[in-house]
Regions:
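Walker A/P-loop
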Residues: 2-22
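Hydrophobic anchor at the beta1->P-loop junction of P-loop NTPases
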Residues: 7, 37, 151
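Conserved Walker A/P-loop ATP-binding site and its immediately adjacent core
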Residues: 16-18, 31-54, 157-162
């Protein structure tokens, strides 16, 4: 019953199956009754159309709702059914872009607050920017989840700083820093710059990476 895990697994090694197996085990133990799965817009429907149906054991009854900013009647009914009382394992599938919108945040918050849920972010580098609205929203919402998971083959795509927000979503205490800026100051070589009358900090190199 580990509360948080990062599945840093290369493409093709079965991240989706590992997550769904974990969800099934937690559901079987009575630890959760729902899962909120978040993925990039181009692939998030794969979870409802392929991954869950392929890997979730047939003996587990399930309800699946897929988020859409402009839902059809069928989509609306599927999401509403997630809030009905039942013994089914309930999945809400959302694209990460939804968390830049008030409507998307409200839907996810209601789902997490009314279920014992696992929250998973597929391709978690989509939340690597700590200043992005969707990152801030997801980190805040994750506190309402009973369990948290992130999935990606490459957690660092441009800079060691990429890792902070991903791990912060799992547990803000894991890295041992009180804020992104303290993390940045410890691992980055930061200089003050100015442009157009505005000053800002810029990372020009890295240090302490051997830790």
């Amino acid at each position: 019953k580990q509360r948080e895990y990062a599945y840093f697994m290369e493409m093709g090694t079965g991240k989706s199956k590992v997550l769904i197996d974990n969800i099934a085990i937690l559901y079987g133990k009575g630890a959760i009754n729902a899962a909120l799965i978040i993925a990039p817009k181009g692939v998030y429907r794969n979870w409802s159309e392929r991954e869950i149906e392929t890997h979730l054991p047939d003996c587990i009854s399930r309800r699946i709702g897929v988020w859409s900013a402009s839902p059809r009647k069928k989509d609306q009914e599927a999401i509403l059914s997630l809030f009905e009382v039942s013994e089914d394992l309930k999945f809400l599938i959302m694209n990460v872009e939804a968390f830049s919108t008030k409507k998307g945040v409200i839907c996810a918050q209601k789902f997490l607050q009314t279920h014992n849920a696992l929250l998973a972010v597929d391709e978690s580098t989509t939340i690597k920017n700590p200043k992005a609205a969707r990152t801030k929203a997801l980190v805040k919402l994750a506190k309402h989840a009973s369990f948290r998971r992130i999935l990606t083959g490459f957690p660092i795509t441009q800079s060691p700083m990429d890792i902070y927000s991903q791990v912060d979503l799992l547990n803000p205490n894991l890295l041992g820093f009180s804020s992104y800026y303290s993390f940045q100051n410890h691992y980055g070589q930061v200089v003050n710059r100015s442009f157009g009358g505005r000053s800002f900090k810029q990372v020009v190199g890295y240090r302490n990476l051997e830790e």
